[in-house]
């Protein structure tokens, strides 16, 4: 499995670990007290929690910035900066980061700054950050790489042998390894990654177009829509627009909760990337560990609903979401 994922991402080595959060934890052990890391203000809530509530206690500092603005990223660099953490598209608002521009900024600022990309939302089928100069790519293999919602796992892919050796040493020292059976299941899932991703994004595009035209929807976050501010970047940087989307319901929390409870094909669950469609509420689920102030600064509101589009018939998904919005 490790060889397979390393080849898919174009890295020299992959290290499989027990969970996606274990992959992030493993990467974070490359740093020491006093180091500074730049990350997006709209990243996954679990990542934000680990950074803000755990690693800050170790003396590592973080700047959470608008990663879509490369000048903002550049201005956040300090003499202590050792890494730039990229999550693109971001979770849950599907904001994109210009990977090539950020890696260029990092290289210009000094050889000590490494770039790290969480590629879970796209999978290597749609995006390969190492091609744009990223040093480390990580995944929650629980999601698209496995694709069947029956595994918990993660992995770290390194661009250089030097980084690969450090990652492997830390993984062994920390005891973060993935079980052989889970690795076998992920490898099974990877065999259908291509057809699954094509089905995911067909359904996501159909759903996004319906939501974009629905009177009860205020805004749709999906890079496949031409109205998305990063649509052109997505066309350049990705090989497709993916199966994740979010939208804001006009009438606020009560209406958003009603949509989630009234949908019949979308299971209420926080995970993503499986063959079944899921719906969740970032305000109290995936991003509940962020402070309200941090959520609002990132653009996450009580109106926001996140959807992981499965591989079901797009017409069925559209019809079900429409009846949930209309009810």
Annotated model-derived regions:
Residues 8, 211-215, 263:
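Acidic-histidine catalytic/liganding microenvironments
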Residues 5, 87, 200, 259, ...:
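Residue-level signature of catalytic and energy-coupling elements of molecular machines
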Residues 52-53, 61, 79-82, 109, ...:
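PLP-dependent enzyme catalytic core of the Aspartate aminotransferase-like
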Residues 1-15:
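Active-site-flanking structural segment that lines cofactor/substrate pockets
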Residues 217-305, 309:
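Conserved C-terminal alpha-helix-loop-beta "cap" of PLP-dependent enzymes
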Residues 1-2, 99, 164, 183, ...:
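A general structural signal for well-ordered alpha-helical segments in protein cores
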Residues 1, 27, 166-167, 255-259, ...:
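Hydrophobic side chains in well-ordered alpha-helices
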Residues 13-216, 221:
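Conserved PLP-enzyme active-site core in the AAT-like
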